[in-house]
Amino acid sequence: MSMLDDLPGWGAIPTPVGEFRLRPVRLPADLDLLAGWMNDPEIAAFWELAGPPDVTEQHLRAQLDGDGRSVPCLGLLDGAPMSYWEVYRADLDPLARHYPARPHDTGVHLLLGPAESRGRGLGAVLLAALAERILWRRPCCERVVAEPDVRNRRSVRAFERAGFRSDAELDLPDKRAALMIRARLPLPA
């Protein structure tokens, strides 16, 4: 079993906006698409991966060739690529040095690629759906966490609308981040 409980096999997630699925990134096939998104000024301001495709490729290869604690994925909505996600073991990530991590905390990073996908509420819908799927498929995980840049108000609001709560602000090496947490809801008594 992988560190993320076979994320590629999690299947499609029905949402109000269509069928959502995560597919692990494939190189070199997905590189041009992802490098194009990383060079969009709105995305580049927060992801810092703008530049030639090899900048994006190095970032992806580090995860793909790693030990499985981070899985880079394309987000497909009704079969069309429209987002990029990183699902990772936050408790095993350097992030864990900056907050009181719990075993199996699972982190998410995301970006909505095409400009027409942004500003329509898609991020919140997909975040909520993925957080639920993570908590369902990873019973050992009690929390889904994220750390968007505090300046990225649209992202922070999307996490809030998806049921995450802002827990703290963290001074990370590359940004001041809002620690967002979506905890597993307790079972009714």
Q: What does each model-identified segment do?
A:
Residues 36-50:
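Helix-loop element at the rim of GNAT/NAT acetyltransferase active sites that forms part
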